[in-house]
Amino acid sequence: MPDENKFPLIGEKFPEMTVETTHGSMKLPDQYKGRWFMLFSHPGDFTPVCTTEFYSFARRFEDFQKINTDLIGLSVDSTISHIEWVNWIRDNLKIEVPFPIIGDSMGRVATRLGMIQAESSTSTVRAVFIVDPNSTVRLIMYYPLEIGRNVDELLRAIKALQMSDKYRGAMPANWPYNELIGEKMLNPAPKNVKDATGRLKEFKGYAWWLTYKDVPDNEVQETKKIVKMREEK
C-alpha cells in the first residue's frame, strides 16, 4: 500500500486521487494518461500575484498544448470561489481561463502533495509538479509567495524533458541558448573506460565526460518559438 503521508518525489508515480475541479470530478493521474500535465498550486483566489499568474497561464495555454501538455491549478479555496475568480478574470482582464482548477478547501490534496506553507495550514505555496505520459513525476518546483512563476521557464523545462527522453541525452543550462554549446544537447557520461576512450572520437566536446550532439533543427525552432521571452506591445 502506498504511504499516504509521504510526499511524491521526482521519479515516483504521481499518487492516485479523485479531485473536484471547476470542470467536474477527475481521477488523477488517469485523467491525463498518455499526455504530460502540469499541476500548479497558488496561495489563494482574488490575490494580486496569483491573478497575474493565471492571466499568464491562460494567455500561454496554447503553447502548453503545442507540446502535448495540459494544465490543472489548485488552491485551498472552494470550486465556487474558483468559478467566481475566473469569471472576474474573464470580465475584467478579458481572457478565459481554459484549464480546470482543483477545489481543495479541506487541504487534502495540497497536504498529500506537500504544498502547504510552513507558517500557515490554510494556504498553499506556489508549487509545480510536471508529470509525464507514464504518470511519473519529472520535475518539482517551489516558489515563494512574493514571486510569480516564469511561464517561459516552465515551457522550456517541459520541452527539455521531452527532448532528453526522445534523444537520450541531457539539456544544458539555458537550452536552447546555452553559452557553451548553443542549441546542442549533452551526451550522458561514459559508464566505462572503453566508452570514455572513444567518446571524443565519436562526438565533439571539451573532455571525454563533456561531449555534445545535435538536436534536430525542427525541434530547436519549435522550442525557440514557444519559449522565447517576448516583449509585450
Curated annotation (Swiss-Prot):
Q: Which UniProt keywords apply?
A: Antioxidant, Cytoplasm, Oxidoreductase, Peroxidase, Redox-active center
Q: What is the lineage of its organism?
A: Archaea, Methanobacteriati, Thermoplasmatota, Thermoplasmata, Thermoplasmatales
Does Cytoplasm count among this protein's keywords?
A: yes
Official protein name in the record: Peroxiredoxin 1
Enumerate the HAMAP family for this protein. Answer: Peroxiredoxin
GO MF annotation terms: thioredoxin peroxidase activity
According to its UniProt entry, the function of this protein is described as: Thiol-specific peroxidase that catalyzes the reduction of hydrogen peroxide and organic hydroperoxides to water and alcohols, respectively. Plays a role in cell protection against oxidative stress by detoxifying peroxides.
The protein's assembly and partners: Homodecamer. Pentamer of dimers that assemble into a ring structure.
